[in-house]
Amino acid sequence: FIQNMFLAAATASLGILGAQYWGKGDKKTLDEIFCMALRLCGLVSAIFFVGCVFFGRYLMLIFTNEEVLINYGVSYLKIAGFSYLLTGISQCYLVIMKTSEHAKTTAVISSMTVCVNIILNAIFIFGGFGIVPMGVRGAALATLIARIIELCCSVLISYKPNYLHPSMRDLLRRNKQLSKDFWKCGL
């Protein structure tokens, strides 16, 4: 939930500023904004990944002191934490696709991801197709696989004609004025 709040603010900035620069036809600046969002969402996602994977027990202690629940939570977070690493990046790709008039593509990717997650949840949690029931760990694994598919689809599609993909050069560059605008929109 907390990670999603940060990601929502960053991707909202990407969407707002992105729509302005897309409307102007300024793909260069749009790429810079996309890269800013990727950097920020990547950082936020990395922080939550580290917290969940390496400090899951302490995070669970914030919510409960029941050992059984803590153990379930830790086993979930150790796997699902990796999906948190991917979520911020895939959300940036999906927002830039919407901004650049490819909303249908994002709807297809997002719907497919949800369907994959639901199907894999059923298989992994309860067992099926020769897979042993995994319970909570199965739910985490289903989420991770769905996020991997979502990110892979988003990145691969971004290289199609008329889609935007980030410039590696702009991932390392910082534009002070654009950063101010980005932060204003996000707050």
Give the positions of each predicted feature:
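Hydrophobic/small/kink-forming positions within alpha-helical transmembrane segments
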Residues: 9, 50, 114-115, 148
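Short, Lys/Arg-enriched charge-dense amphipathic segments
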Residues: 91-92, 110-117, 150, 186
